[in-house]
Amino acid sequence: MAGVHIAVAAEAMAFGVRAGADPKALYEVISGSAGSSWMWNNRVPHILNNDYTPLSAIDIFVKDLAIVLGTGHKLNFPLPLTAAAHQQFIAAAAAGLGRVDDSAVFKVFQKLSGVSINQEEEGK
């Protein structure tokens, strides 16, 4: 579930910013709501600080989610949320982010939506 949590946290941040929310205010509101999770509270600060120093890595979630999906396939069990998250991590790895922190999956949503949280990122 960690990979899905990280992907949805990145998606929520990009969506909220696109809707006009202040990134730090959005983080605080969700942190105090039922939508919060350990992954939200741990990974979103990396996004807000543009700090993708690897504590874990995109490539790890590409591998781990592939294992989960393979098991689901063997059991003939649908895993649509896992599959969607896996595709976002694959996109991040394909963009050259495989060895950076898994929270950098946000950069996929950033690229797709055109949102920017940090001024340093605006030209990227």
Each language-model region and where it sits:
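ATP-dependent carboxylate/acyl-activation modules
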Residues: 115-124
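Beta-strand segments within the central parallel beta-sheet cores of soluble alpha/beta enzyme folds
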Residues: 22-32, 83-87
